[in-house]
Amino acid sequence: MSRRAPDFWFQPPGLRARLLAPLGALYAAATARRLARGPRTRPGVPVICIGNLNAGGTGKTPTTIMLARLLQDRGVAVHIVSRGYGGSEKGPRRVEEARHSAAEVGDEPLLMAAFAPVWVADDRLAGARAAVEAGAQAILLDDGFQDPALAHDLSLVVVDAAKGFGNGLCLPAGPLREPVDRGLARAGLLLSIGEAAAQARFAATLGTRLPLPHLTGRLAPLQTGMDWQGQRVLAFAGIGHPEKFFATLRGLGADVVRAEALEDHQPFTPQLLIRLETESRLTGAQMVTTEKDAVRLPRSFRPKVLALPVRLQLDDAAPLEERLASLGL
């Protein structure tokens, strides 16, 4: 099933959006009722939720990795809890890189397991309790902003600055899981990710009366010593916004011979891999993908593909550091 967001979500509301708006209102009402029920249980250690208001990719995974490394640098034993979207494991189960596959635990948890202990669990509360029993001093909740089962000591809402909050309507009329004003009223920090021009446009749509501190940041390629200048590449990506990955490669000087935009979490079937490898050989282009896609590749195929890692860089981390300090972290 396709998970790529339809274009009309990010355009001024037209006929299609207006026709679907009543369903969006019902979706928003259902979310509000679910959030009101609670029970908002506390697992005994600080819980930091990295969530979003939009459906789809907004940069939660690199944000979670950044927070994990920040807390580790402070000597905090931090664990990550995730639903493990796309994986078959119901959990709670600790992710083991050498043992588990993306089909079992999901691609994001498998990627994040290289940075911190990760637990996948359909029941986030059960996952948090398992993490605490294993020694977690703080929990990063990957997604779950609209899940009332677990109390959040700090909620960080992540948004793609280039996409913003789309047409401002809830699913299926727009990209939102809940109305922007309600969501931001429950959050502790807003983080927009993107380049300077996109950040300026997004800030203009927000106005000056935000109810919470606004962080900005961007995803920057990790310096690995690889010289991309003039390198012929066949790039493929199955992430929320694959065009950003292709633009990053071009910005590094790579000659992108072909850019294959896959659906988010699209399976790598044998037929797809054979086609990519054949095109790579015929064009003399090196296959390149994202870190998240690389962990989904069959182990036997991975040596044929380069991965381009990116890391989140905050413009000013002070508001985040203040919130962490208030939690004793």
From Swiss-Prot:
Enzyme class: transferase
Any single GO BP term: lipopolysaccharide core region biosynthetic process
Biological function: Transfers the gamma-phosphate of ATP to the 4'-position of a tetraacyldisaccharide 1-phosphate intermediate (termed DS-1-P) to form tetraacyldisaccharide 1,4'-bis-phosphate (lipid IVA).
GO molecular function, one term: tetraacyldisaccharide 4'-kinase activity
A Pfam family per the record: LpxK
Gene giving rise to this polypeptide: lpxK
Binding site for ATP: 54-61
Keyword Transmembrane in record: no
GO cellular component: a single term: plasma membrane
HAMAP family (alphabetical): LpxK (MF_00409)
Protein family (similarity comment): Belongs to the LpxK family.
Protein name as catalogued: Tetraacyldisaccharide 4'-kinase
EC number: 2.7.1.130
